[in-house]
């Protein structure tokens, strides 16, 4: 199925609910005469614990939990741990942490797919006894060769085995008496079906492998298409909401629940298009490769699309939930622009982030007519959009730091910052200054900018109503500022479609996805903020303090590496919004 590129607009958010076809189906089901009339809407989120949740999972999370919330219903969290190869309790814990961080809760409805292994086995035996399943001895190669084609039925010489023989062989499989790959249990449906998922699919296979919860108790494991509908039915799920690739599996889902004697109602499976974002890969296999081959620092690298990576970068739960609401629910696969996600974060942080000043590429500014040793205190607002966030104090002295590009000895046209004998400029929250010159080293590099201040312009207001044409500049006091490391993140992939056909996604990596700046200057209160964050018990599971560095962007303390003695900030998102409105 082809994917369309999709740019959402603010108007999309307003109509997203009207486009949610899932809600329309549920409304029909719970209405008078519907199959779930009078019942509580009950959904589930069933992640496989073989990796960390990423932004692609968030759409399903918001749909599963959000739908239940909308109808005052229930949503289960079920670990789909029926494939033991790469499952681990590390991922189980991380998944629970990420879901709670997003603001969802499953109450006492936490389950494992492996909780149902005994029931899965019983229902498999029931199918055999009904003549609806058989043990097949085709090797994987033979299975593939005998699968048939469009208009050509599949073949299995074992399809008509007697029921008693199938029961005996399946018991041997369960008892570990059959080598791995020698036998499978297949559902007996229709070898000529146009839907290849219905051509007697494998529902059990042999794996001699340790399970993260069951150990070596089981050596046969149910396939997802068999276990999933049974688990849904046993948990009382009304609506099994899943991504679009399972649409062709729905006939098998329905076949399973209709042919085993589960004494509950039959769930309804509904599919929706999964989330794809440009400049990103969502495949767990590819993400694992990035981690294991050290293209990134770990699963929580801020360039990764994992929730722990996004959280470390400064993404908030509210911004991610707003993003999922904005893009809506549809049946057509599409690729969302990364700028849409950034827009949602920028909107959230604009309202919540405290403003502070930080200089990333510092050059010294000396106010030559300001007394040596003198210091003043100024009060600056924490957030101009929300006066209730209050103010904080900054100090001003003769020696300051400003951004290197806020001075130009030979200015380009329309340059409105500091230049010798140029325009007067405001130092944010303090005084008006005018550049008088600069100091250079032996190589001709500017090491110090010289200026004079207007003593009558305290707070940045010119005396006698004088109009100031220069820019307002951010700065920090060189006498008490803190040094910091600042990490500037960009897209991990320079190619918008690293998952595209005939591409090696590793060839699409962006060599400029991380720039590390040292010797940056930040306000002294940042040490206090970092010291408070150091006291947090679960630093990586929560958002670190986030700020708007005035004129620069939104930044957060790194929730893993930053300390009160070594400040590390991650750029969450730039100030400039590339989102198409």
Where are these regions (language model features)?
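Active-site cores that bind ATP or allylic diphosphates and position pyrophosphate for catalysis
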Residues: 77, 81-83, 89, 126-287, ...
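Secondary-structure transition/capping motifs at alpha-helix termini
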Residues: 32-37, 66-74, 100-107, 130, ...
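A glycine-rich helix N-cap at a beta->alpha junction
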Residues: 91-117, 123-124, 131-134
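Conserved short loop/turn motifs at secondary-structure junctions
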Residues: 46-49, 78-86, 108-118, 141, ...
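Long, charged, mostly alpha-helical binding arms that flank functional sites
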Residues: 265-344
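N-terminal catalytic cores of NTP/NDP-binding nucleotidyl/phosphoryl-transfer enzymes
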Residues: 15-26, 31-96, 211-243
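N-terminal acidic, proline/glycine-rich, low-complexity intrinsically disordered segments
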Residues: 1-9
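Core subunits and conserved enzymes of cellular information-processing
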Residues: 246-250, 254-256, 321, 325-328, ...
């Amino acid at each position: 199925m082809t994917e369309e590129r999709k740019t959402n607009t603010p108007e999309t958010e307003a109509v997203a609910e009207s486009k949610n076809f899932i809600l329309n189906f549920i409304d029909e089901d719970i209405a008078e005469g519907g199959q779930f009339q009078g019942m509580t809407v009950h959904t589930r989120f069933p992640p496989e614990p073989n990796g960390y949740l990423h932004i692609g999972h968030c759409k399903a999370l918001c749909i599963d939990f959000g739908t239940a919330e909308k109808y005052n219903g229930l949503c289960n969290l079920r670990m789909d741990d029926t494939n033991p190869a790469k499952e681990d309790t590390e991922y189980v814990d991380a998944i629970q942490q990420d879901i709670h961080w997003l603001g969802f809760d499953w109450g006492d409805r936490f389950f494992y797919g492996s909780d149902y292994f005994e029931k899965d086995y019983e229902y498999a035996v029931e199918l055999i006894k009904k003549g609806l399943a058989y043990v097949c001895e085709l090797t994987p190669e033979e299975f593939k060769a005998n699968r048939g084609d469009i208009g050509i039925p599949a073949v299995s010489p074992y399809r008509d085995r007697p029921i008693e023989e199938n029961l005996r062989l399946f018991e041997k499989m369960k008892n570990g008496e059959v080598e791995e790959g020698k036998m499978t249990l297949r559902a007996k449906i229709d070898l000529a079906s146009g839907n290849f998922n219905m051509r007697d699919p494998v529902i059990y296979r042999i794996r001699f492998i340790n399970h993260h919860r069951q150990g070596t108790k089981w050596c046969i494991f149910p396939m997802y298409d068999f276990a999933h509908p049974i688990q849904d039915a046993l948990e009382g799920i009304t609506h099994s909401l899943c991504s679009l690739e399972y649409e062709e599996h729905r006939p098998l889902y329905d076949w399973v629940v209709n042919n085993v004697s589960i004494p509950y109602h039959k769930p309804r499976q509904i599919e929706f298009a999964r989330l794809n974002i440009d400049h990103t890969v969502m495949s767990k296999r590819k993400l694992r490769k990035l981690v294991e081959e050290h293209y990134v620092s770990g699963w929580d690298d801020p360039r990764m699309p994992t929730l722990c990576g996004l959280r470390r970068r400064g993404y908030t739960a509210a911004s991610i939930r707003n993003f999922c609401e904005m893009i809506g629910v549809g049946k057509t696969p599409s690729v969302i622009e990364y700028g849409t996600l950034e827009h949602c974060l920028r909107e959230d942080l604009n309202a919540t982030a405290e403003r502070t000043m930080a200089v990333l590429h510092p050059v010294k500014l000396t106010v030559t007519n300001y007394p040596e040793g003198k210091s003043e205190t100024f009060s600056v607002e924490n957030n101009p959009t929300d006066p209730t966030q209050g103010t904080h104090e900054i100090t001003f002295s003769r020696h300051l730091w400003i951004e290197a590009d806020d001075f130009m000895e030979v200015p380009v046209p329309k340059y409105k910052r500091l230049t010798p004998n140029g325009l007067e400029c405001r130092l944010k929250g303090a005084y008006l200054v005018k550049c008088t010159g600069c100091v250079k080293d032996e190589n001709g590099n500017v090491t110090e900018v010289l200026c004079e201040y207007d003593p009558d312009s305290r707070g940045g207001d010119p005396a006698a109503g004088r109009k100031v044409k220069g820019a307002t500049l951010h700065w920090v006091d060189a006498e008490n500022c803190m040094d910091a490391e600042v990490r500037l993140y960009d897209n991990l992939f320079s190619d918008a479609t690293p998952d595209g056909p005939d591409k090696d996604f590793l060839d699409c990596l962006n060599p400029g996805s991380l720039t590390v700046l040292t010797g940056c200057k930040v306000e002294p209160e940042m040490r206090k903020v970092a010291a408070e964050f150091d006291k947090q018990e679960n630093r990586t599971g929560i958002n670190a303090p986030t700020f708007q560095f005035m004129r620069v962007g939104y930044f957060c303390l790194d929730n893993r590496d930053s300390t009160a003695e070594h400040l590390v900030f991650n750029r969450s998102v730039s100030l400039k919004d590339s989102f198409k409105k």
